[in-house]
Amino acid sequence: MKDWYLLYCKRSEQERAVINLDRQGVECYYPQVTVQKIVRGKRIECAEPLFPGYMFVYFDPEDISYTTIRSTRGVANFIRQGATPQTVQPDLIYGLMMNEDNEEH
C-alpha cells in the first residue's frame, strides 16, 4: 500500500533527487515558499524550499524497496523511528499542498 515518507537529501541535491526518483516512478513533493531577495541591488522573487534538505515521497514499499530509494543519487536517508522509515499522515501533505496553492493565487 502506498504511503508518504520523509527523506533527508544530500546538501544542495534536492533537485537531483527529484529527477532520479521521478525516473523510478516515485511521486515527490517538497513544499516551496516565494521569498523576496535583493540581488545586485534589485529585488527579485524566488522559490525556496519550506523544509530545506527534506522531501516527501509517495510509494509502495512492496513495489520499490527502501534500499532502492535510499541509494538514489541525491538521497541521504529516510527519517526513521528506530529501524523503520516513518510514514507521514496524508492529511499533513494535502494541507501543505493546499496552503502552497493558496499562496500562488
Task: Annotate each predicted stretch with a short phrase.
Residues 1-105:
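Acidic-enriched and Gly/Ser
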